[in-house]
Amino acid sequence: MNKKVKKIFQSNEPYIFLIIILLGIVVQIRSGQFFTANNIVDLLSAMIVPGLFAIAEFMALIAGGIDVSFPALASLSAYATTKFLLDKNYEGNVLLAFVIAIAIGAVLGAFNGYFIGYLNLNAMIVTLGSASIFQGIMQGTLRANQLSVIPPGMKSFGTAAFLTATNKANGLTSILPYTFIILVLVCAVMHFVLHYTTVSYTHLTLPTI
């Protein structure tokens, strides 16, 4: 047990966590609203998209490269999927949207992977270029603009509340969407992959816990 505790405090993460807690306490003292239930729910909700992006980028970093195209790739996948389903007047559940978006993302990722993995080009240079290509496809080919309407299934999933919290002091209610579960599942899968598969031995050394 002592060895595990010692290993934990030899890394940077516990100290970053403590700094965040201390900052939260300072804000709580000044405003009295930081540790309220609805604010915690808002923070968790705000973590979903950055958290998914961070996990994906982390995998690229431990593989020895850096991907700067992922915001453009994600935007193109999401926009193309939404536009396609709108054009087809699709009114089914959100599962098809996930399948299409993942397929588009896989194709775009394979495009990057070909130049990086097979042609041995610098990952940062390749993804800088592909980011411009993806943005060009969105703006030029798809003529992207703000979508005021999205398919019913996507809207229902995005607005469905996994958890709600109300601040009794001011009456504000916050909603944690079901996409938070996706973030938790992705974190769990990555934890397993990085600690209990050959990936952890090939690219980095992580203790099994």
Predicted regions and their residues:
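Generic alpha-helical transmembrane segments of integral inner-membrane proteins
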Residues: L18-V26, I55, V99-F111, I137, ...
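Conserved small/polar residues in nucleotide/adenosyl-binding loops
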Residues: T202-T208
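Hydrophobic alpha-helical transmembrane segments
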Residues: P14-L18, L43, A72-L73, L95-A103, ...
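Single transmembrane alpha-helix segments in multi-pass membrane proteins
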Residues: V27-R30, F34-K88, Y114-L121
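Transmembrane helix-bundle core of multi-pass membrane transporters
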Residues: K7, M124-V199
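Membrane-interfacial amphipathic/re-entrant helices at transmembrane-helix boundaries
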Residues: M1-A54, K88-L96, T173
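Alpha-helical transmembrane segments within multi-pass membrane transporters and channels
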Residues: Y90-A131
